[in-house]
A protein has these predicted regions:
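Flexible, glycine-rich beta-alpha linker
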Residues: 118-119, 164-185
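Substrate-positioning beta->alpha
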Residues: 96, 183, 200-221, 227
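Active-site Tyr-X1-5-Lys
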Residues: 139-167
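A conserved pocket-lining segment of Rossmann-fold NAD(P)-dependent short-chain dehydrogenase/reductase
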Residues: 135-140, 189-207, 211
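NAD(P)H-binding glycine-rich loop region in Rossmannoid oxidoreductase-like domains
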Residues: 36-42, 46-92, 100
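Conserved Rossmann-fold NAD(P)-dependent oxidoreductase catalytic core, especially the SDR/UDP-sugar
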Residues: 89-143
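Mid/C-terminal beta-alpha module of Rossmann-like enzyme folds, strongest
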Residues: 215-282, 299, 304, 313-328
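N-terminal Rossmann NAD(P)H-binding glycine-rich loop of SDR-like oxidoreductase domains
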Residues: 3-25
Length: 328
């Protein structure tokens, strides 16, 4: 089987490459499609093709004679100044990848969406389901989720040309070892470094990168087109999460938990002052606002059709902490 991966140099992409290699696929049959080569890909021995998801012709060439495409490319940013780049990568890039795969005769595309497209609520007692409505009313104010939601709609829709099947997987917050770039585990790192001054009032769902990667491998031959597949382990409040991290690490838990609105207002006021002083704000306004919401989700499809059974949350947190402490 010949496999191409956009965004294959990222945290999830490298884990998917490793999972395929562990299953016996030759690294030479794995081609990472990206604008630049991540140094860790050299250790895996996978092939590399220079191409951007914003270049349709380059993608068509990259997908020629490929059986399976993983579309994992994305830009994780809470900075509103990155809105244009996120639209180009998420929306235009997904459209380009789907069209290129169809034109190349690729049999299947597995697309990495997010639980944030549907799994977000102000009410912690209401846990959104993968078959429920999207969360546009809440999350569209942030460019990352707005563009991921638009991209997901493209992937869920019937493909207008060709026989390419598209499977949409929705991983929650991805934790675990190996996030050398800090793209997904920064909040845990901030806790370890004492950069979490208050406890937010929201909640999260998270999943181990190794479990998510295994599900992406299984999705090469399983999954339901036109439907979301939640990859999540557990819904926890931020308070519960930091309590677990404190027990694992000995790092003291912040005791101050002001009302959600006050946290958001304070971050909005303090962030410009920090930047004027040439410093990064401890908590930027977008992060503060997101942290007051409950990014909870539920669903059984991945368990039923992909055999997805995540490891315990404590194991994931312990391995995340162990990795981050080893590279600090």
């Amino acid at each position: 089987m010949r496999i191409a991966l956009t965004g294959g140099g990222g945290f999830l992409g490298r884990a998917v490459c490793r999972a395929w290699i562990e299953r016996g696929v030759s690294p030479k049959d794995l081609t990472v499609v990206s604008r630049s080569r991540h140094p860790l890909l050299d250790e895996l021995g996978v092939a590399h093709r220079v191409a951007s998801v914003t270049d349709p012709e380059a993608l068509r060439r990259a997908f020629a004679e490929v059986d399976l495409v993983y579309h994992l490319a994305g830009l994780v940013s809470r900075d509103p100044r990155d809105a244009g780049r996120m639209r180009a990568i998420h929306v235009d890039g997904t459209r380009n990848a789907l069209q290129a795969a169809s034109a190349a005769g690729v049999r299947r595309v597995v697309y990495a969406s997010s639980t944030g497209t549907f799994g977000c609520t102000r009410d912690p007692s209401r846990v959104p389901h993968e078959d429920g409505p999207d969360a546009a009313e809440i999350v569209s104010r942030w460019a990352y989720y707005r563009t991921k939601l638009e991209a997901e709609r493209l992937a869920l829709a019937p493909q207008p040309e060709g026989d390419t099947t598209v499977i949409v997987l929705n991983p929650s917050l991805i934790l675990g070892p190996g996030d050398v770039d800090g793209s997904s585990t920064n909040d845990v790192r901030d806790f370890l470094q004492g950069r979490m001054p208050v406890i937010a009032r929201g909640g999260v769902n998270f999943v181990d990168v190794r479990d998510a990667a295994a599900a992406f491998v299984t999705a090469a031959d399983a999954g339901e087109p036109g439907a979301r597949h939640l990859l999540g382990a557990e819904n926890v409040t931020v308070e519960e999460l930091v309590d677990r991290l404190s027990r694992l690490t000995g790092v003291r838990v912040p005791k101050f938990s002001p009302p959600a609105g006050l946290q958001v207002l304070a971050s909005a006021a303090l962030a410009p002052m920090a930047r004027l002083l040439g410093r990064e704000p401890m908590v930027d306004p977008a992060t503060a606002a997101m942290a007051q919401l409950h990014w909870f989700a539920s669903g059984e499809r991945a368990r039923k059709v992909l055999g997805f059974v995540p490891r315990t949350a404590d194991e994931t947190l312990a391995d995340t902490v162990g990795f981050l402490r080893g590279i600090r």
